[in-house]
């Protein structure tokens, strides 16, 4: 170490370069999250659809990125068994009503 270099100010270029690297890395992570969230959403929809009769638009996936932590929030609207049965019964009732209305009048009166 040279005696004259002891009193010399350190160059700010390496510090600025390190800060720029950190900033670029942070931005790349933030930009890449949209792809990650879309991929996660597709996989979550596929897994849930195996077990529950849900529509794709009933599943919402959000990622919030903070300074120290990122949070993945998944909101799923799963129909209760009662709702599924009511829908099935309503469809069956509609089919029966349609079949009854499509019968000829003579057959219904003759029986």
Swiss-Prot record:
SUPFAM superfamilies: Cell division protein MinE topological specificity domain. One of its GO terms (biological process) is cell division. The keyword Amino-acid biosynthesis does not apply. It holds the Pfam family MinE. InterPro entries: MinE, MinE_sf. Keywords: Cell cycle, Cell division. Belongs to the MinE family. Prevents the cell division inhibition by proteins MinC and MinD at internal division sites while permitting inhibition at polar sites. This ensures cell division at the proper site by restricting the formation of a division septum at the midpoint of the long axis of the cell. This is Cell division topological specificity factor.
């Amino acid at each position: 170490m040279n005696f004259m270099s002891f009193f010399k100010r350190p160059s700010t270029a390496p510090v600025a370069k390190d800060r720029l690297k950190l900033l670029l890395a942070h931005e790349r992570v933030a930009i890449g999250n949209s792809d990650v969230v879309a991929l996660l959403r597709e996989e979550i929809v596929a897994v849930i659809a195996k077990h529950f009769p849900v529509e794709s638009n009933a599943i919402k996936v959000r990622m919030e990125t903070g300074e120290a932590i990122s949070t993945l929030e998944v909101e799923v609207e799963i129909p209760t068994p009662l709702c599924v049965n009511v829908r099935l019964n309503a469809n069956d009732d509609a089919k029966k009503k349609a079949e009854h209305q499509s019968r000829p009048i003579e057959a219904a009166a003759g029986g």
